[in-house]
Amino acid sequence: MAAAATSKITLTSSDGVDITIDRQVAERSILIKNMLKDLGDSGEAIPIPNVNESVLKKVIEWCKHHKGDPPSTGDDDVDSRRKTTDIDEWDQKFMQVDQEMLFEIILAANYLDIKALLDVGCKTVANMIKGKSPEEIRKTFNIQNDFTPEEEDQIRRENEWAEDR
C-alpha cells in the first residue's frame, strides 16, 4: 500500500494540459479517488473536463498543503467549526484571488468533491457579504439591480423581520 500512496498520477485539464501529481494529493478529491479505484493502476491520464489548467493548478496547490489533513467525515454536526466563517490564515491567503478565480475554485471543488476546499471558498464569499447592505453586495459582485422601486419596497416590507436592528 505504501507504494500506491507515493505513486504519481496524471490529470488532464479541460484545456488539454497534463499535470502529474502525487496520488495522495489527488485523493483529496473524492471524485478522483473513486475514479482511481475504478481504473485501477492503468496509468492512464484522468480527464478533468470541467476544470481548466490554471484553476486545476490552484486546486492542486491547496490539496498539496492539506494532504495530511484528516478526510472530511461528511457529518457537519460532528465538526462544529464548519458552522463558523473562520478561515485558517493559510487558506485566507490562498483565497486572495480575483472573484472569477474564486468562483472557479468553488465550482472545481464542488465538481471534484473536495468538501473542505468548497467550505473554504463558500466561507470566503460569506465573509465578503457579511454585514453588507444589498446595495453594497451588488457593488461587490457587480450585480445590476433589476427591481423597480415598488418591487424593492415590497421585498423590504416582506423581509423586515430579517433586518439588523
Curated annotation (Swiss-Prot):
Pathway: Protein modification; protein ubiquitination. Pfam families: Skp1 (PF01466), Skp1_POZ (PF03931). The keyword Transport does not apply. Keywords: Ubl conjugation pathway. The keyword Transport does not apply. Residues 106-165 are annotated as: Interaction with the F-box domain of F-box proteins. It comes from the Eukaryota. One of its GO terms (biological process) is protein ubiquitination. Induction: By fluconazole, an azole-derivative widely used for the treatment of fungal infections of the skin and its appendages. Belongs to the SKP1 family. PANTHER family: SKP1. Essential component of the SCF (SKP1-CUL1-F-box protein) E3 ubiquitin ligase complexes, which mediate the ubiquitination and subsequent proteasomal degradation of target proteins. Controls sulfur metabolite repression, probably by mediating the inactivation or degradation of the metR transcription factor. Component of the SCF (SKP1-CUL1-F-box protein) E3 ubiquitin ligase complexes. This is E3 ubiquitin ligase complex SCF subunit sconC. The gene is sconC.
